[in-house]
């Protein structure tokens, strides 16, 4: 393959990639900030015991949390499911610890569904959350929160 053909292939590939990225961004870009805000409403609501923020983040009608837990009697791992309405109630008071969160990835599909990967750190535990959201009539709401937690030494 000569240099001109190689350059043409490279330019065509770059143009295709740039066009695909630009198109995808314009389709979901207007919703990106709303999805980010919903994820941080959850995080800030939990950290600050702010039920109003949690209500803005969670779909209390259909939402659930799934988590790995260990059965105290058998010692076996199990998957526990808790309605988001109940889960929100766990955060009635602000934490005295410093919590931090970083969004690792956002995937938005047709401005109707989104998934956010959230790196969530507290002094005692490190979490990775996957937040699945639907855009409802009242905005973006978390309908499924799945996470793993690792206790720190």
Language model features: what each stretch is:
Residues 64-77:
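A short gly/proline-enriched turn/hairpin at secondary-structure junctions
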């Amino acid at each position: 393959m000569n240099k001109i053909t190689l350059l043409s292939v490279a330019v065509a590939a770059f143009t295709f990639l740039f066009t695909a990225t630009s198109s995808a961004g314009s389709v979901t870009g207007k919703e990106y900030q709303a999805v980010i805000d919903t994820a941080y409403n959850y995080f800030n609501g939990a950290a600050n015991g702010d039920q109003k923020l949690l209500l803005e983040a969670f779909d209390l009608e259909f939402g659930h949390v799934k988590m790995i837990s260990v059965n105290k009697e058998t010692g076996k791992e199990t998957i526990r499911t808790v309605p988001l309405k109940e889960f929100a109630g766990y955060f009635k008071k602000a934490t005295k610890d410093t919590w931090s969160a970083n969004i690792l990835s956002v995937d938005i599909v047709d401005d109707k569904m989104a998934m956010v990967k959230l790196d969530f750190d507290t002094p005692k535990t490190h979490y990775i959350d996957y937040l699945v959201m639907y855009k409802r009539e009242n905005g973006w709401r978390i309908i499924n929160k799945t996470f793993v937690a690792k206790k720190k030494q």
